[in-house]
Amino acid sequence: MAKVLVMAQVQDGMQWETSLRTHGDVFKTYGLLGPVQFAVSGNEVALCFETADAQAFLKTMNEPQTVEAMKVDGVKRETVKVYVLDKSVF
C-alpha cells in the first residue's frame, strides 16, 4: 500500500474541480484503495491517492486516458509533480 501526492497548476480551479468529479471511470483503473482526497487553492491543486501498487499507479499517469482527462480538466502538464509518500515520522 502506498500514498501518492500529485500537485499541479490548472487554468481554473473551480472548473478543474467540477471536471474532476466526472472521472470516476478513469480513477477505477488506478487500483485505488480509497477515495481521492484533494484540495484547491486558486489555480493550484493537490490530490492524494492511496493505491496498492505505486509503480503501477505512476504508469497510469502517462496513459492516454489520464493525459486526456488532464487536458479536459485544464491541468498544465508541465507543472505536474508526483510524490510517493514512502517515509513517516511515527
Question: Where do the language-model regions lie?
Answer:
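Short S/T/G/P-rich N-terminal loop/turn motif that feeds into the first structured element of a domain
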Residues: M1-F90
